[in-house]
């Protein structure tokens, strides 16, 4: 690892902006990072920070530190400040509202006898196609009632064999049944995967003709999409996924580059659990007009596409302003001075924007970006930079939850502590106005548990202790921080979350336990080698190997990944189970945050190394607009 030189913290008064724009002055910080002050028996200790990230030889006055050597922030602050917001003119909003009305009229035509969408031979597929299209184009929030009406109609004709293309279609149709299974299940309707049994031949196998037409390929593509919404024990869904994956990979070798091939490549790569809605919308806008296999009037496709582009760009202008606000917050709190840590606030905000595209959810997007960034800095303090003595002091300060606690902290910790204290309290107070109950104490308790898990891991690192797999996972589910990044932003969304519902989503619910376990395990499969190189031996992989002497590292990784796959199916069920009593829309927020982190760990540790995939995501969904 390369040496990282410490940069002095700003000695001026630190003007701190809270999440909602209020400001106040913090006490001046007069010491620099290499001259840290901390309380011990009334004496000030000033340890040096100049040491290797892999070895440390300290004398009486030096504290050994490990530094990870993370790369710097990739997004130039001046460039972010100069981003244009060219779609804020009222005329764009007026144009979008006009198109929304026209699309609503198209939905209304579905209830007209003998209308363009009501042929008894194709009406079911028409409805499913409309619902699927507005969802993938990112404009579904405007048509909630219309979507419910369309799906109620489809479900009224659903049978144990699935459906045909229309209510009088007769023969079960692969495309309509697969799309119906996926869409109805995602909207909370009770549909069995056994409908897919009726799409097999007499040998119990999925089959298709040797001639791979565009229509047939799209049929199998929807079968693949449906197979991903699997519950535990659904062998038919596993078989459908295996068959459709092989078929689509073979088709890619035969068809020319096109919108269809682009869509196949995208879905095979991202599936469902690493597929972020705005990211898919950006792809789907590019390929939407190329499907010529479905008998939808050209004018209808054009209206949907025009609305999707306008909505994407209007939201794009809002996203840029929010990102500029986040960048100012990052600078005002002095985060650029913390040179030993990762700075991924732009990436975190982008990920939030990819799952929450309602303009009203600004507090959620900014809150997620800020909390995730602060957690990342704390992670680097507890895992690498802080000494055990400093970490004990910081942990005690968080337990007291009192600004006066910072007097005994090293200077570099003071600013971080106050950033957390200010923003969490402010967000909790704003959430309390919405929820009508004490979210401040609720948030504080969740942070106490989170910090407690951090100090436990720090003790393991300091002592060289390698826990059992179960011991590690139980602590790791808390230390990952997904509960923190989910809970507080979710409480600002504007809909009530009474304790009765919250307890089904938050700790200690099974839903929360599954999301935390999935993310801890998935993250460890991508991080364990780099963590080990920094002296952080405990991981899901290494602890599993400890519990199973003789197993190879590769086999341990495969076992952990298999656990993730099984837990993911359990999470699907917890999200969509019809008997939970909690609306899917409430749980979907936490589920989508799980998808965010799943995406970040798809290729590597995307939160330590900002990969080309993450950079492309920021460019495609935040920096660039869609050509109209």
From Swiss-Prot:
<dbReference type="GO" id="GO:0010333">
    <property type="term" value="F:terpene synthase activity"/>
</dbReference>
<dbReference type="Pfam" id="PF01397">
    <property type="entry name" value="Terpene_synth"/>
</dbReference>
<feature type="transit peptide" description="Chloroplast">
    <location>
        <begin position="1"/>
        <end position="18"/>
    </location>
</feature>
<dbReference type="GO" id="GO:0016102">
    <property type="term" value="P:diterpenoid biosynthetic process"/>
</dbReference>
<keyword id="KW-0456">Lyase</keyword>
<feature type="binding site">
    <location>
        <position position="383"/>
    </location>
    <ligand>
        <name>Mg(2+) 1</name>
    </ligand>
</feature>
<dbReference type="InterPro" id="IPR036965">
    <property type="entry name" value="Terpene_synth_N_sf"/>
</dbReference>
<dbReference type="InterPro" id="IPR044814">
    <property type="entry name" value="Terpene_cyclase_plant_C1"/>
</dbReference>
<keyword id="KW-0809">Transit peptide</keyword>
<dbReference type="InterPro" id="IPR050148">
    <property type="entry name" value="Terpene_synthase-like"/>
</dbReference>
<dbReference type="GO" id="GO:0050550">
    <property type="term" value="F:pinene synthase activity"/>
</dbReference>
<dbReference type="Pfam" id="PF03936">
    <property type="entry name" value="Terpene_synth_C"/>
</dbReference>
<comment type="pathway">
    <text>Secondary metabolite biosynthesis; terpenoid biosynthesis.</text>
</comment>
<dbReference type="GO" id="GO:0009507">
    <property type="term" value="C:chloroplast"/>
</dbReference>
<keyword id="KW-0460">Magnesium</keyword>
<keyword id="KW-0934">Plastid</keyword>
<keyword id="KW-0479">Metal-binding</keyword>
<dbReference type="GO" id="GO:0010597">
    <property type="term" value="P:green leaf volatile biosynthetic process"/>
</dbReference>
<dbReference type="InterPro" id="IPR001906">
    <property type="entry name" value="Terpene_synth_N"/>
</dbReference>
<dbReference type="InterPro" id="IPR008930">
    <property type="entry name" value="Terpenoid_cyclase/PrenylTrfase"/>
</dbReference>
<dbReference type="GO" id="GO:0016114">
    <property type="term" value="P:terpenoid biosynthetic process"/>
</dbReference>
<feature type="binding site">
    <location>
        <position position="531"/>
    </location>
    <ligand>
        <name>Mg(2+) 3</name>
    </ligand>
</feature>
<dbReference type="GO" id="GO:0018867">
    <property type="term" value="P:alpha-pinene metabolic process"/>
</dbReference>
<dbReference type="InterPro" id="IPR034741">
    <property type="entry name" value="Terpene_cyclase-like_1_C"/>
</dbReference>
<comment type="function">
    <text>Monoterpene synthase (TPS) involved in the biosynthesis of monoterpene natural products included in conifer oleoresin secretions and volatile emissions; these compounds contribute to biotic and abiotic stress defense against herbivores and pathogens. Catalyzes the conversion of (2E)-geranyl diphosphate (GPP) to (+)-alpha-pinene.</text>
</comment>
<comment type="similarity">
    <text>Belongs to the terpene synthase family. Tpsd subfamily.</text>
</comment>
<dbReference type="GO" id="GO:0000287">
    <property type="term" value="F:magnesium ion binding"/>
</dbReference>
<comment type="pathway">
    <text>Terpene metabolism; oleoresin biosynthesis.</text>
</comment>
<dbReference type="InterPro" id="IPR008949">
    <property type="entry name" value="Isoprenoid_synthase_dom_sf"/>
</dbReference>
<feature type="binding site">
    <location>
        <position position="379"/>
    </location>
    <ligand>
        <name>Mg(2+) 1</name>
    </ligand>
</feature>
<feature type="binding site">
    <location>
        <position position="379"/>
    </location>
    <ligand>
        <name>Mg(2+) 2</name>
    </ligand>
</feature>
<protein>
    <recommendedName>
        <fullName>(+)-alpha pinene synthase 1, chloroplastic</fullName>
        <ecNumber>4.2.3.121</ecNumber>
    </recommendedName>
</protein>
<dbReference type="InterPro" id="IPR005630">
    <property type="entry name" value="Terpene_synthase_metal-bd"/>
</dbReference>
<keyword id="KW-0150">Chloroplast</keyword>
<feature type="short sequence motif" description="DDXXD motif">
    <location>
        <begin position="379"/>
        <end position="383"/>
    </location>
</feature>
<feature type="binding site">
    <location>
        <position position="383"/>
    </location>
    <ligand>
        <name>Mg(2+) 2</name>
    </ligand>
</feature>
């Amino acid at each position: 690892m390369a040496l990282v030189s410490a940069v002095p913290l700003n000695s001026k008064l630190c003007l701190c902006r809270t999440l909602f724009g209020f400001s106040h002055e913090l006490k001046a910080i007069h010491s620099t990072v290499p001259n840290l002050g901390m309380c011990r028996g009334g004496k000030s200790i000033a340890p040096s920070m100049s040491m290797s990230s892999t070895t440390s030889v300290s004398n009486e006055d030096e504290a050994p530190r490990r530094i990870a050597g993370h790369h710097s922030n990739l997004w130039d602050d001046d460039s972010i400040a100069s981003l244009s917001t060219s779609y804020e003119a009222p005329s764009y909003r007026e144009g979008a509202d006009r198109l929304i009305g026209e699309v609503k009229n198209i939905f209304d035509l579905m209830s007209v006898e003998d209308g363009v969408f009501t042929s008894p031979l194709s009406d079911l597929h028409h409805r499913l196609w409309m619902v699927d299209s507005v969802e993938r184009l990112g404009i579904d929030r405007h048509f909630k009632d219309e979507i419910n009406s369309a799906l109620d109609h489809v479900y009224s004709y659903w049978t144990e064999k699935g459906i045909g293309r229309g209510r009088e279609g007769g023969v079960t149709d692969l495309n309509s049944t697969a799309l119906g299974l996926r869409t109805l299940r995602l909207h909370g309707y009770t549909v069995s995967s056994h409908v897919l049994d009726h799409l097999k031949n007499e040998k119990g196998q999925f089959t298709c003709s040797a001639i791979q037409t565009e229509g047939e390929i799209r049929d199998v593509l929807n079968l693949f999409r449906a197979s991903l919404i699997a519950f535990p024990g659904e062998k038919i869904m596993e078989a459908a996924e295996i068959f459709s994956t092989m078929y689509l990979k073979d088709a890619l070798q035969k068809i020319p580059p096109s919108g269809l091939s682009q869509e196949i490549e995208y879905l095979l790569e991202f599936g469902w659990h690493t597929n972020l809605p705005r990211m898919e919308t950006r792809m789907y806008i590019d390929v939407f007009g190329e499907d010529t296999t479905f008998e939808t009037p050209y004018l209808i496709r054009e209206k949907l596409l025009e609305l999707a582009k306008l909505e994407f760009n209007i939201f794009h202008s809002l996203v840029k302003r929010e990102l500029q606000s986040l960048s100012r917050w990052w600078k005002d709190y002095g985060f650029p001075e913390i040179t030993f840590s990762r700075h991924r606030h732009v990436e975190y905000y982008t990920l939030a924007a990819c799952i929450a595209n309602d303009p009203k959810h600004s507090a959620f997007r900014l809150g997620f970006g800020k909390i995730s960034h602060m957690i990342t800095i704390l992670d680097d303090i507890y895992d690498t930079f802080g000494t055990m003595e400093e970490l004990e002091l910081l942990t005690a300060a968080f337990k007291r939850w009192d600004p006066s606690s910072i007097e005994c902290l090293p200077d570099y910790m003071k600013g971080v502590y106050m950033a957390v204290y200010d923003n969490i309290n402010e967000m909790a107070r704003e959430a309390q106005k919405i929820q009508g109950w004490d979210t401040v104490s609720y948030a504080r308790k969740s942070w106490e548990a989170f910090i407690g898990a951090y100090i436990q891991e720090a003790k393991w690192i300091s002592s060289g202790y390698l826990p059992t797999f179960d011991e590690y996972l139980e602590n790791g589910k808390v230390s990952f921080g997904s509960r923190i990044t989910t809970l507080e932003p979710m409480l600002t969304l504007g809909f009530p979350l009474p304790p009765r519902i919250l307890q089904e989503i938050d700790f200690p619910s099974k839903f929360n336990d599954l999301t935390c376990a999935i993310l801890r395990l998935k993250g460890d499969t991508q991080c364990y080698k780099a963590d080990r190189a920094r002296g952080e031996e405990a991981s899901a992989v290494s602890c599993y190997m400890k519990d199973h002497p003789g197993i190879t590292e590769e086999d341990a990784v495969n076992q952990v990944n298999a656990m993730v796959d099984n837990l993911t199916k359990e999470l699907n069920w917890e999200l969509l189970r019809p008997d939970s009593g909690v609306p899917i829309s409430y749980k979907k927020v936490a589920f989508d945050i799980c998808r965010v982190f799943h995406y970040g760990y798809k290729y590597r540790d995307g939160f330590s190394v900002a990969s080309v995939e993450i950079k492309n995501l920021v460019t495609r969904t935040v920096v660039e607009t869609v050509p109209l």
